C-alpha cells in the first residue's frame, strides 16, 4: 500500500468519539457522536518539507498545527526523521480547553479503549496518525497528577491543556516520499490538490528593529536560586533539580511567528519541532526531546541531560564532546535521570520489560550538543496511554529527582509559573498511539511580545555561574531566530 501514489477518494475509516465542546464537561453533555468518515488521498511528496506543505494548505487558517521532523535526519538520530504532520482548523465543536482537574477525565474519555473505534484497513498501519487529536499539556498539568503548592502565577494567556480534532490533516512520509491527505469532505481533495500544485511564493523577511530583551531573573538572582537548590541537595531533599529563567523580547512591530519558526528550523533543525497557531497566540518550538511515545503496546521515553556548546571548528567540537563524555557531574546527572525514567515507566509497564536500549548517545544541534538515552518497555495490558502520560509527566529532565519534591522546590524558587514551557505537545491517535515532546527551545508569541524560557540541571557540585552561562547558551538559537529575520 505504501507505494500507491494516486487518489482513492474513498471512505476508509470511521469510529466513535465523545462530543466535547470546550470548558467544563470532560464527559460530554451530548453523548457519543460518530466520527465522520475520512476521505484519503495519496500523492507523491516530491521532496517537499512539512513547512512547505503547511504553508500551502493551512498557512492561512487561524487555527493550525505543524509537527515537523527534518529529513534527511541528522546522522546522530536518523530514525527520528521519517514523518511530519500538519493540520488545519478543528471540526465544529471539536476543540477543548479544560481546567487542570478535568484533563485526565477528558483523556480517559478520548482513549480508544473506551470506544468502539472502527479502524481502516486500507491505510498503512505504519502511518503515525490515522485521525484523532492534536494538542498540548502545559506544565501545570502536574497539578492534576500530584498535590502541589500554589504560590506563583502564570501571566501568559495559554490554557493549561488544549486538544482539538482537525477537519483536515496531512501525513508526510519522508522516507517513502509519499503525502497522505485526509479530509472529511471529499470535495476538499481536489481543492487541496490544486493548492499543492501551486508554486510556493517565498516571503521576504521584514527588517525587524532591535529587540528589547529582558530577563525575569538576572544573573545574581539565578545564582541565588542555584545555591538554594544546592542547599536542598545537601540536606538530602533532592539529588538534582532543573531551574529556569524566562526572557521577554519586545519590538515596535509585530514579529511574524511563522517566519521565526522557519528561520529557527533552518538554523537549528530538531526532530520534535512544532508550530501552533491558536486563539491565544502562537507557539514555536524546536524541541530535541521526546517525553513519551506509545505505539501499540511499546512505550518509550528519550531523556536529554548533559549539554556542551558547539565548537568553532571540528577539532574544538570533538574536544568539547570528549570533555562532556568524561565529566563526572554530567554523567552522574544523566544516569540519575535515566533511572528516574526507568522507574516512571516501570509503574505502568510489564515487569522485566523496561530497558535502556540507547545510553549516552551524542546528538548535535546548531548551538549545543547533548547526551541522550532511550528507555522503553511494554505497557501492561490493563494500562492505557493516559496512565502512561500520568506516570511520566512532567519530564524528569526538566524537573529533577525525586520529581515531586523538585516540583515543590521549583514552585518556591522560580519567580513565575512555567506556562506551556516544559509541558508537552503532540498527537493522540484514534488507535491509542501517541507521541509527545517536551516543550523546550520554545517561544510563545502573544500580543506585543515573545516569551522564552531556558534552564539547567543543578547538582551538588554545580557552579552557579556556569549554570547561568549554560542557560544563556541554550537561549542563543532562539534569540538568533528572532534577531536574524
UniProtKB/Swiss-Prot annotation:
Keyword field: Amino-acid biosynthesis, Aromatic amino acid biosynthesis, Lyase, Magnesium, Metal-binding, Tryptophan biosynthesis
Pathway(s) per entry: Amino-acid biosynthesis; L-tryptophan biosynthesis; L-tryptophan from chorismate: step 1/5
Any one GO BP annotation for this protein: L-tryptophan biosynthetic process
Positions that bind Mg(2+): 333, 470
One Pfam family of this chain: Anth_synt_I_N
InterPro entries: ADC_synthase (IPR005801), Anth_synth_I-like (IPR019999), Anth_synth_I_N (IPR006805), Chorismate_C (IPR015890), Para-NH2Bz/anthranilate_synth (IPR010118)
UniProt cofactor(s): Mg(2+)
Keyword Isomerase part of the UniProt annotation: no
Cofactor binding annotation: Binds 1 Mg(2+) ion per subunit.
UniProt: chorismate binding residues: 306-307, 441, 455-457
EC number, as in UniProt: 4.1.3.27
GO molecular function: anthranilate synthase activity; metal ion binding
Family of the protein in this entry: Belongs to the anthranilate synthase component I family.
Subunit and interaction comment: Tetramer of two components I and two components II.
Name of protein: Anthranilate synthase component I-like protein
Organism: Synechocystis sp. (strain ATCC 27184 / PCC 6803 / Kazusa)
Name of the coding gene: trpE2
Amino acid at each position: 500500500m505504501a507505494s500507491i501514489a494516486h487518489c482513492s477518494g474513498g471512505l476508509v475509516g470511521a469510529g466513535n468519539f465523545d462530543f466535547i465542546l470546550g470548558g467544563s464537561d470532560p464527559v460530554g453533555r451530548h453523548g457519543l457522536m460518530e466520527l465522520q468518515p475520512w476521505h484519503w488521498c495519496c500523492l507523491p511528496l516530491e521532496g517537499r518539507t512539512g513547512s512547505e506543505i503547511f504553508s500551502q494548505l493551512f498557512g492561512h487558517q487561524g487555527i493550525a498545527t505543524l509537527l515537523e521532523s527534518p529529513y534527511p535526519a541528522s546522522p546522530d538520530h536518523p530514525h527520528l526523521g521519517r514523518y511530519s504532520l500538519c493540520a488545519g482548523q478543528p471540526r465544529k465543536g471539536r476543540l477543548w480547553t479544560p481546567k487542570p482537574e478535568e484533563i485526565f477525565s477528558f483523556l480517559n474519555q478520548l482513549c480508544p479503549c473506551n470506544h468502539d473505534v472502527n479502524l481502516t484497513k486500507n491505510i498503512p498501519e505504519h502511518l503515525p496518525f490515522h485521525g484523532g487529536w492534536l494538542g498540548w499539556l502545559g506544565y501545570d498539568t502536574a497539578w492534576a497528577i500530584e498535590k502541589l503548592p500554589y504560590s506563583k502565577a502564570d501571566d501568559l494567556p495559554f490554557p493549561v491543556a488544549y486538544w482539538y480534532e482537525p477537519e483536515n490533516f496531512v501525513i508526510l512520509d519522508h522516507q517513502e516520499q509519499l503525502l497522505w491527505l485526509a479530509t472529511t469532505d471529499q470535495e476538499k481533495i481536489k481543492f487541496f490538490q490544486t493548492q499543492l500544485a501551486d508554486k510556493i511564493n517565498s516571503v521576504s523577511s521584514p527588517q525587524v528593529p532591535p529587540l528589547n530583551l529582558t530577563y525575569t531573573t538576572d544573573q545574581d538572582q539565578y545564582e541565588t536560586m542555584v545555591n538554594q537548590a544546592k542547599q536542598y541537595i545537601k540536606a538530602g531533599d533532592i539529588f538534582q533539580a532543573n531551574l529556569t529563567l524566562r526572557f521577554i523580547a519586545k519590538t515596535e512591530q509585530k514579529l511574524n511567528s511563522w517566519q521565526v519558526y522557519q528561520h529557527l528550523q533552518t538554523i537549528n533543525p530538531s526532530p520534535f519541532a512544532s508550530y501552533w497557531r491558536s486563539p491565544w497566540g502562537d507557539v514555536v518550538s524546536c524541541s530535541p526531546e521526546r517525553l513519551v511515545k506509545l505505539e501499540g503496546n511499546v512505550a518509550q521515553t528519550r531523556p536529554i541531560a548533559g549539554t556542551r556548546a558547539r565548537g568553532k571548528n571540528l577539532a574544538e567540537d570533538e574536544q568539547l564532546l570528549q570533555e562532556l563524555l568524561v565529566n563526572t557531574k554530567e554523567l552522574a546527572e544523566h544516569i540519575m535521570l535515566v533511572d528516574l525514567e526507568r522507574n516512571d515507566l516501570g509503574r505502568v509497564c510489564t515487569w522485566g520489560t523496561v530497558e535502556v536500549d540507547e545510553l549516552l548517545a551524542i546528538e548535535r544541534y546548531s548551538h549545543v550538543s547533548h547526551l541522550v538515552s532511550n528507555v522503553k518497555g511494554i505497557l501492561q495490558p490493563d494500562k492505557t496511554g493516559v496512565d502512561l502520560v500520568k506516570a511520566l509527566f512532567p519530564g524528569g529532565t526538566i524537573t529533577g529527582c525525586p520529581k515531586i519534591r523538585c516540583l515543590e522546590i521549583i514552585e518556591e524558587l522560580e519567580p513565575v509559573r512555567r506556562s506551556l514551557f516544559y509541558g508537552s505537545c503532540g498527537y493522540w491517535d484514534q488507535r491509542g498511539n501517541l507521541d509527545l515532546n517536551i516543550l523546550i527551545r520554545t517561544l510563545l508569541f502573544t500580543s506585543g511580545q515573545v516569551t522564552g524560557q531556558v534552564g539547567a540541571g543543578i547538582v551538588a557540585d554545580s557552579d552557579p555561574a556556569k549554570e547561568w552561562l549554560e542557560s544563556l547558551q541554550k537561549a542563543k538559537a532562539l534569540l538568533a531566530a528572532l534577531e536574524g529575520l
